[in-house]
């Protein structure tokens, strides 16, 4: 069975479990009362809140975007409390958001539009994302943003296990989350380094992505390229490495709704709602 089939055979159930967990957490939030709709069902409350949010966004889209960037992603209030905490938060959240966006662009253009361009020439521009001029920017961006996540994770670990502020409580959930992130980032860089050090991995199409552009194998992928210098003599089954990274990634994906990482999603809603109350949208 080819890698695409194996991946989607694992990804689709993972997506279902992720949405199931997200739905469960959402149902807990919707148990509260909604002003003016005290007797509404959970589904009715969800529809009302979505409607209010959409109407507000349509009136002031730039305001919503500004609040999302300044108050959620870069958490400006935290900056005044602790630069270290602010830096850790910003590296992790911005790193995750940026990596997700770039990865979605790369995956959609190189994984779908390139295929569609074979029968629909209108999508031929997508080849610039696969092997053309845009590809080096994608490779470097993914590398850089992944490095930000790794740096933020290390800062969080140092604060929790070395500095240990008196007011900070480290729970088992925090340890699991940080170790998950650390493992996924390190394994990702290791696999990239091994792939660069062993060109036969690319020719055998062990991984799903297209690694033909030179930018995928040189200093633009700086983390993997540096590791590749030490992995040329190492022999590891590349299929094993693929599973070692993909399976924990999907487990982590399922785990998100049940972890404090859900804060990345819920905090944006809470912060924007609070700001909207202080500054009514007219």
What are these regions (language model features)?
Residues 1-282:
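Membrane-embedded alpha-helical bundles of multi-pass integral membrane proteins
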């Amino acid at each position: 069975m080819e890698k695409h089939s194996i991946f989607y055979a694992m990804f689709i159930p993972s997506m279902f479990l992720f949405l199931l967990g997200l739905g469960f957490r959402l149902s807990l939030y919707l148990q509260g009362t909604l002003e003016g709709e005290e007797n509404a069902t959970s589904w009715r409350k969800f529809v009302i809140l979505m409607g209010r949010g959409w109407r507000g966004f349509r009136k002031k889209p730039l305001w919503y975007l500004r609040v999302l960037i300044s108050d959620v992603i870069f958490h400006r209030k935290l900056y005044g409390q602790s630069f270290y905490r602010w830096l850790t938060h910003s590296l992790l959240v911005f790193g995750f958001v940026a990596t997700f966006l770039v990865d979605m662009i790369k995956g959609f253009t190189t994984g779908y539009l390139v295929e569609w361009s074979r029968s629909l020439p209108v999508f031929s521009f997508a080849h610039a994302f696969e092997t053309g001029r845009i590809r080096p920017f994608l490779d470097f961006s993914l590398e850089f943003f992944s490095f930000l996540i790794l740096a933020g994770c290390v800062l969080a670990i140092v604060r929790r296990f070395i500095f240990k502020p008196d007011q900070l409580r480290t729970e088992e959930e925090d340890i699991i989350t940080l170790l998950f992130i650390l493992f996924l980032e390190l394994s990702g860089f290791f696999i990239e380094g091994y792939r660069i050090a062993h060109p036969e991995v690319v020719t055998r199409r062990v991984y799903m992505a297209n690694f033909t552009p030179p930018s995928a194998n040189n200093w633009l992928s700086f983390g993997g390229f540096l590791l590749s210098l030490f992995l040329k003599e190492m022999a590891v089954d590349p299929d094993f490495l693929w599973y070692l990274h993909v399976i924990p990634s999907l487990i982590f994906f399922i785990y998100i709704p049940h972890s404090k990482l859900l804060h990345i999603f819920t905090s944006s809603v809470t912060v924007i709602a609070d700001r909207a109350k202080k500054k009514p949208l007219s």
